[in-house]
């Protein structure tokens, strides 16, 4: 929302400086985005050439006597179009040309003093190409006035709930409530007949007296009013109105159109002016027919449907309600009769129509945020009077149609809530004053309980908490008391964000997939019971809520492989629905292809099941679960390879699964290469804090020993790891670094190579202790699995 300082001061009586005003705006929640202060352009003046004579020393130059409104100056000029009586732009001494950054000084040109420069459009950066002559101004420019509008322009961000602040008057009201100034009252005379100052009977749709245009509403959700102004003389807007609109980025069209834009910017009341002679019969607010076409004021043609409200007569559509007027009835300089519309349209309908048609206008922006229904008639009076004042003509009575819910919104409010929930110290009289200045009517029902009537322009205020916010906002967020933090407060860390950081650090890319999947695919993954069936799926491939993220990740993997991305690591955190209870959040990841991108430093290798296991363990460690406290068992999920997968459990509860995906599952997605994956249910981790395990500094040297056992191929590797871990308190780490089966080994046998780390927290281990622990490991594995030591 852009406005000038002088525009604001028409609505706000204040002695505050520009800086004080902008600071206060930000403090009350109307964030100042930008302030453009054009005072550096104050030296460019509207001037008039009084006399032109040849330069005594140069044929191509001329001596000009120029009136700048206060004195006559001598200017040397070489422009071909300089002549007596011409109004142009004078760059006064001390001003700086925008194009060249040249500062104007008294200069002798071929022996003759020049006291300024007569400017071309390109020198003022008003034209892209170099101008051939100096600027020629129309007669409505007054000599001595500043050429540029040097009024500071303030640009603020307005949140979607504050449609009332999409107007200069609404902004002034908020500022006045802070005590920085006083809101000026809305006083106007009206060109509309005096007996028609209100809308008393809206049940009489289309009431009219002297207008030749009637109105009707049949879309069931709109209200429209209007006035017919005859015998107008439309023309260019006066300079003050042009300057005001152009300063906030609006293009001047004509006096009638500019007046409607001026009312919109001043009071937040969108309006539309029709060339009344182009309207045949009634103006009707209705739903468009499918396939109807409409050409807007912007010259574009739009294909409409029956969700879009339009305003039409017997033959043509003249506007899309609340969004844009039609080309067929636009006001031009030849317009003599005007129908001026002031209406209320449903914000949701305007928003939907605007999105469907991809049209965004100043009008739709305001209607979508709910304009003030209480200002419909006032806006009509303001605009009609301005049109009659500037363009002449005679206004009819008001016509209106449709329904408008003007029921008063009242909120029961305990003023003690302000200090209780806002952590401020505001006196009741101060609260009462703030609410009154914001337009709320407050009746004190009891000492503590107030009955507050909400003004028509504040549709966002509906509950007591809204009133608490209003008081605290105006009183000052900077006055909220500081509260010391309580000692030993546990900081809640976002689990999902921590896991995302971890996965990305391990080379994964995050993806987001649908929460739906195909029931037939789910059944092939072993999910057949307790599925969440969707009653109205948008297609049969998405007819259940997903019981696992893995199938969706496999589909993403397949799509990437088809497009040449055979090396892939992706993960997702999202809800899964594996029972009829509430959804649970899962972390799932997939790897395929090589473990590293090709490079000349390292040799890549194909990913394997141990990569997936390492990913899962890294995720579990975020929950303070060390690898030593985990048990590994055969995978419970049917879609993993039975001999190359596992379940990691913590405190007898399954926390995650990992493994190579079953070949039959990969065939479903037409994947021809090895894929490994993992998944964990975050709720299964309980209420453990999400933090790294405290580092233990072992002061004594650790010792590593490698063991290779020959065991039957049906022995679970996880079982061996678990028993070795638990065999001694001196063992700090156990991991598999090699699995072999093939030549020189019986078909039903395999070799499992373990690396075991020993360390004592109290002393450095001696060889006898290490040998004792090693023998215990060999005996333990042989006793429980029949495995024999191959080498150490």
UniProtKB/Swiss-Prot annotation:
Cofactor: Mg(2+)
Gene Ontology molecular function, alphabetical: ATP binding; magnesium ion binding; phenylalanine-tRNA ligase activity; tRNA binding
Biological processes annotated in GO: phenylalanyl-tRNA aminoacylation
Domain FDX-ACB intervals: 698-790
SUPFAM superfamilies: Anticodon-binding domain of PheRS, Class II aaRS and biotin synthetases, Nucleic acid-binding proteins, PheT/TilS domain, Putative DNA-binding domain
EC number assigned by the record: 6.1.1.20
GO cellular component, one term: phenylalanine-tRNA ligase complex
Reaction equation(s) it catalyzes: tRNA(Phe) + L-phenylalanine + ATP = L-phenylalanyl-tRNA(Phe) + AMP + diphosphate + H(+)
Residue ranges annotated for the B5 domain, each copy included: 406-482
Chief localization: cytoplasm
Membrane-spanning intervals of the chain: none
Pfam assignment, any one: B3_4
Enzyme type, top EC level: ligase
Record's keyword annotation contains Chloroplast: no
Binding site for Mg(2+): 460, 466, 469-470
tRNA-binding domain: residues covered: 38-148
Location of this chain's protein in the cell: Cytoplasm
Keywords annotated in UniProt: Aminoacyl-tRNA synthetase, ATP-binding, Cytoplasm, Ligase, Magnesium, Metal-binding, Nucleotide-binding, Protein biosynthesis, RNA-binding, tRNA-binding
Cofactor detail note: Binds 2 magnesium ions per tetramer.
Gene3D superfamilies: 3.30.56.10, Bira Bifunctional Protein, Domain 2, Ferrodoxin-fold anticodon-binding domain, Nucleic acid-binding proteins, Phenylalanyl-trna Synthetase, Chain B, domain 3
Recorded superkingdom: Bacteria
Family that this chain belongs to: Belongs to the phenylalanyl-tRNA synthetase beta subunit family. Type 1 subfamily.
Quaternary context: Tetramer of two alpha and two beta subunits.
Protein's name in the database: Phenylalanine--tRNA ligase beta subunit
UniProt organism field: Wolbachia sp. subsp. Brugia malayi (strain TRS)
Source taxonomy: Bacteria, Pseudomonadati, Pseudomonadota, Alphaproteobacteria, Rickettsiales
């Amino acid at each position: 929302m852009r406005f000038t300082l002088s525009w604001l001061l028409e609505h706000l009586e204040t002695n505050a400086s520009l800086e004080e005003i902008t600071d206060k705006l930000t403090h009350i929640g109307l964030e100042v985005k930008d302030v453009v202060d054009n005072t550096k352009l104050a030296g460019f003046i509207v001037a008039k050439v009084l006399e032109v004579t040849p330069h005594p020393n140069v044929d191509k130059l001329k001596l000009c006597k120029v009136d700048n409104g206060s004195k006559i100056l001598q200017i040397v000029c070489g422009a071909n179009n300089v002549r007596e009586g011409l109004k142009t732009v004078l760059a006064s001494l001390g001003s700086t040309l925008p194009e060249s950054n040249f500062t104007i000084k008294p200069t002798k040109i071929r022996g003759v003093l020049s006291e300024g420069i007569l400017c071309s459009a390109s020198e003022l950066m008003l034209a892209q190409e170099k101008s051939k002559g100096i600027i020629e101004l129309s007669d409505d420019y007054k000599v001595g006035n500043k050429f540029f509008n040097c009024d500071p322009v303030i640009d603020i961000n307005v949140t979607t709930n504050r449609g009332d602040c999409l107007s200069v008057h609404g902004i002034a009201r908020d500022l006045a409530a802070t005590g920085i100034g006083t809101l000026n009252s809305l006083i106007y005379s009206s060109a509309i007949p005096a007996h028609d100052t209100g809308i008393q009977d809206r049940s009489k749709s289309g009431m009219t007296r002297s207008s030749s245009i009637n109105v009707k509403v049949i879309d069931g959700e709109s209200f429209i009013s209007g006035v017919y102004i005859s015998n107008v003389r439309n023309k260019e807007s006066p300079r003050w109105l042009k300057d005001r609109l152009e300063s906030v980025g609006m293009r001047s069209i004509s006096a009638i159109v500019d007046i409607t834009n001026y009312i919109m910017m001043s009071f937040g009341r969108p309006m539309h002016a029709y060339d009344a002679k182009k309207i045949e019969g009634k103006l009707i607010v209705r739903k468009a027919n499918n396939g109807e076409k409409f050409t807007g004021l912007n010259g574009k043609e739009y294909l409409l449907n029956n969700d879009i409200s339009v305003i039409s007569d017997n033959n043509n559509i003249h506007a899309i309600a609340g969004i844009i007027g039609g080309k067929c009835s636009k006001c031009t300089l030849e317009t003599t009769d005007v129908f001026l519309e002031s209406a209320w349209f449903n914000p949701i309908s305007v928003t939907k129509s605007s999105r469907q048609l991809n049209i965004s206008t100043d009008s739709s922006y305001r209607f979508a945020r709910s304009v003030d229904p209480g200002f419909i008639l006032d806006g009509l009076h303001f605009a009609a009077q301005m049109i009659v004042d500037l363009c002449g003509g005679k206004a009819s009575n008001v016509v209106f149609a449709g329904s408008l819910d003007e029921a008063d919104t009242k909120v029961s409010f305990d003023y003690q809530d302000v200090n209780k929930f806002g952590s401020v110290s505001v006196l009741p009289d101060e609260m009462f004053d703030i609410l009154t200045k914001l337009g709320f009517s407050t009746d004190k029902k009891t000492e503590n309980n107030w009955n507050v009537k909400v003004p028509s322009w504040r549709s966002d205020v509906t509950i007591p908490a809204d009133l608490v916010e209003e008081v605290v906002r105006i009183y000052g967020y900077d006055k909220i008391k500081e509260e010391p933090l309580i000692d030993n407060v546990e900081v809640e860390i976002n689990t999902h964000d921590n896991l995302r950081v971890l996965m990305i650090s391990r080379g994964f890319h995050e993806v987001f997939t649908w929460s739906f999947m195909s029931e037939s695919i789910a059944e092939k993954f072993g999910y057949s019971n307790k599925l969440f069936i969707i009653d109205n799926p948008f297609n049969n491939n998405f007819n259940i809520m997903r019981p696992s993220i893995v199938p969706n990740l496999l589909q993403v993997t397949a799509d990437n492989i088809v497009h040449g991305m055979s090396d892939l690591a992706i993960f997702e955190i999202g809800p899964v629905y594996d029972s009829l209870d509430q959804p649970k959040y899962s972390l799932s990841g997939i790897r395929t292809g090589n473990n590293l991108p090709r490079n000349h430093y390292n040799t890549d290798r194909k990913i394997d099941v141990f990569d997936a296991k390492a990913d899962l363990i890294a995720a579990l460690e975020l929950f303070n679960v060390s690898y030593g406290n985990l048990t590994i068992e055969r995978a419970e999920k049917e879609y993993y390879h039975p001999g190359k997968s596992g379940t990691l459990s913590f405190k007898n509860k399954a926390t995650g699964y990992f493994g190579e995906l079953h070949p039959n599952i990969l065939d479903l997605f037409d994947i021809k290469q090895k894929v490994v994956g993992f998944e964990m249910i975050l709720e299964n981790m309980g209420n453990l804090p999400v933090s790294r395990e405290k580092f233990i500094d072992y002061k004594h040297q650790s010792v590593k020993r490698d063991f290779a056992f020959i065991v039957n191929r049906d022995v679970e590797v996880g079982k061996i790891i678990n028993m070795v871990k638990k065999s001694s308190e001196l063992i700090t780490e156990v991991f598999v670094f090699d699995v072999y089966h093939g030549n020189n080994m019986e078909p039903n046998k395999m070799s499992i190579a373990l690396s075991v780390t020993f360390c004592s927290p109290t002393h450095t281990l001696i060889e006898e202790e290490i040998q004792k622990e090693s023998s215990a490991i060999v005996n333990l594995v042989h006793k429980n699995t029949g495995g024999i030591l191959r080498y150490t």
